[in-house]
Swiss-Prot record:
Enzyme class, first EC level, given as a word: ligase
Binding site for UTP: S13, K188, T189, K190, P191, T192, Q193, K224
Database matches in PROSITE patterns: GATASE_TYPE_1 (PS51273)
Name by which UniProt lists this protein: CTP synthase
Binding site for L-glutamine: Y54, G354, L382, G383, M384, Q385, E405, R463
Protein's UniProt keywords contain Nucleotide-binding: yes
Any Pfam family matching the protein: CTP_synth_N
Active site, UniProt feature: C381 (nucleophile), H508, E510
Residue numbers binding CTP: S13, D148, I149, E150, K188, T189, K190, P191, T192, Q193, K224
Annotated region (Amidoligase domain), positions in chain: 1-267
Lineage: Bacteria, Bacillati, Bacillota, Bacilli, Bacillales
Length: 535
């Protein structure tokens, strides 16, 4: 029978609930259990697809094309699984589903209420996550903080699930903060006590409490928390700040959270073999070289907007014993002199995905500088589109070439709308989303990066595409179309001939990178950047 773990948070946000949930998932997977994981977000947006990166950070795209919370990236990277559309549920999505059912008459004229209709819909989403994957364990993170009005329907739903499936099949893990008061020279447990009291007032008794802390927590303090929160002191778990995220699963194993979980469910599972993971942590802590990458974007004040890109660069660095240092370069503020000054300091240039016209000229000029000065360049999604525009302008001679997204009246729309996108009016959920195959061309850097694979599969999130009207004209000047859709219609990867490493792709390879298995194009890019640094 499927087991359900619910991870809640108290006191403050950004405690690391997502990392805790992902780490526990990794430990249980390494014990031989199949695991899936999901996140409930209490905001009323249907999904984060149309939200500003300043508000929400990056949008993580799943294999089946769902636009989701960035925590799903942590889940996939830690547990090494592919998630799906059931893995991120928002209040907006729940209410949309219930309202559609009401309009269809599914409720037979009854009054539609938060309880039972909204809570039943939430419970259905939990159960679907398990049914879709056949997982032994479903881990659900509840976004927000206990006490928030927005989270109440979710907390009520997970309270009810204990009655639906039996108390032996449900476990509640509560994450809280134990602050250190510098003036008093001591840590305080009161916030944790009050947070658990609030949770218990909603009918949920935590089975384990994870304490986020800067310093070691004494046995006496654990016993005090256990006493006031009515929990076994062995189930009070210390989670100290770590120098790398990938240390957290090891720390939680040392605190025996996975064993406590197995005991709670009555599961007899072998000890989790974490030797490979410990090797990863040891490697991360002892990198001997440094490579500098210039990331040119418009959301550089908020690194979470490019979280998966940053993690993928780091993963690739691990394979080269290299610590990747990122230089955040704001494309809106780049003058010609600044481009030379900033990019002369780096070993590689990356232009990631994005939307809109802000900062476009700075990105195009950065791409030109990388191309003309033989600096390794990697473009992703918008980065590929702008690399095409730059080449069309400065090599082919189409000085007014542009993307139709940025300038709908350009005489040379090198980048244009996909035909199926031309009559779409809604922004949300209407992009080309999810995993699609790409056929690679022999003798190209893209095919070399993928170890000679003929066809690869990567995730997409875009509305515009390379305009095939310009394909022959650009190919004649050394623009290489190294990957296309299997039917040859859509351009997926491009390169520049006779450049040490100038590769760009329409898809988002950052979504498939793993800490123990770097994504192929990122690995190729960092390898080229390491070589560039050597001179």
């Amino acid at each position: 029978m499927t087991k359900y773990i619910f991870v809640t948070g108290g006191v403050v946000s950004s405690l690391g609930k997502g990392i805790t949930a992902a780490s526990l998932g990794r430990l249980l997977k390494n014990r031989g259990l199949s695991v899936t994981i999901q996140k409930f977000d209490p905001y009323i947006n249907v999904d984060p697809g149309t939200m500003s990166p300043y508000q929400h950070g990056e949008v993580f795209v799943t294999q089946d094309g769902a636009e989701t919370d960035l925590d799903l990236g942590h889940y996939e990277r830690f547990i090494d699984i592919n998630l799906n559309k059931y893995s991120n549920i928002t209040t907006g999505k729940v209410y949309s589903s219930v309202i559609r059912k009401e309009r269809r008459g599914d409720y037979l004229g009854g009054t539609v209420q938060v309880i039972p209709h909204i809570t039943n819909e939430i419970k259905d989403q939990v159960f679907r996550a398990g049914e879709a994957t056949g997982a032994d364990v479903v881990i659900t993170e509840i976004g927000g903080t206990v006490g928030d009005i927005e989270s109440l329907p979710f907390l009520e739903a997970i309270r009810q699930i204990k009655s639906d499936v039996g108390r032996d099949s449900v476990m509640y893990v509560h994450c809280t903060l134990v602050p250190y008061i510098k003036a008093a020279g001591e840590m305080k447990t009161k916030p944790t006590q009050h947070s658990v009291k609030e949770l218990r007032s909603l009918g949920i008794q935590p089975d384990a409490i994870v304490l986020r802390t800067e310093m070691a927590i004494s046995k006496d303090m654990k016993e005090k928390i256990a006493l006031f929160c009515d929990i076994d002191d062995k189930s009070v778990i210390e989670m100290r700040d770590a120098d790398t995220l990938y240390q957290v699963p090891i720390a939680l194993q040392e605190e025996k959270l996975d064993q406590i979980t197995c005991n709670h469910f009555g599961l007899d599972c072998p000890e989790a073999d974490m030797e490979e993971w410990k090797g990863l942590v040891n490697k991360v802590r002892n990198l001997s070289k440094t490579t500098h990458i210039g990331l040119v974007g418009k959301y550089v004040e908020l690194p979470d907007a490019y979280l998966s890109v940053v993690e993928s660069l780091k993963h690739a660095g691990y394979d080269y014993d290299t610590d990747v240092k990122i230089h955040w370069i704001n494309s809106e503020l780049l003058s010609e002199e600044q481009i030379k000054e900033e990019l002369s300091k780096v070993d590689g240039v990356l232009v990631p995905g994005g939307f809109g016209d802000r900062g476009i000229d700075g990105k195009i000029e950065a791409i030109r500088y990388a191309r003309e000065n033989n600096i390794p360049f990697f473009g992703i999604c918008l980065g590929m589109q702008l690399a095409s525009v730059e080449f069309a302008r400065n090599v082919v001679g189409l000085s007014q070439a542009h993307s139709a997204e940025i300038n709908p009246h350009t005489p040379h729309p090198v980048i244009d709308l996909l035909p199926e996108q031309k009559d779409i009016e809604d922004l949300g959920g209407t992009l080309r989303l999810g995993a699609y195959p790409c056929k690679l061309v022999d003798g190209t850097k893209a095919k070399e990066a993928y170890d000679g694979a003929d066809v690869i599969e990567e995730r997409h999130r875009h509305r515009y595409e390379f305009n095939n009207v310009y394909r022959d004209q650009m190919a004649e000047k050394g623009f290489v179309f190294s990957g296309t859709s299997p039917d040859g219609r859509l351009v997926e990867t491009i390169e520049v001939k006779d450049h040490p490493w100038f590769v760009a792709c329409q898809f988002h390879p950052e979504f498939t990178s793993r800490p123990t298995r770097a994504q192929s194009l990122f690995k190729g890019f960092i390898g080229a950047s390491v070589d560039y640094r050597k001179g």
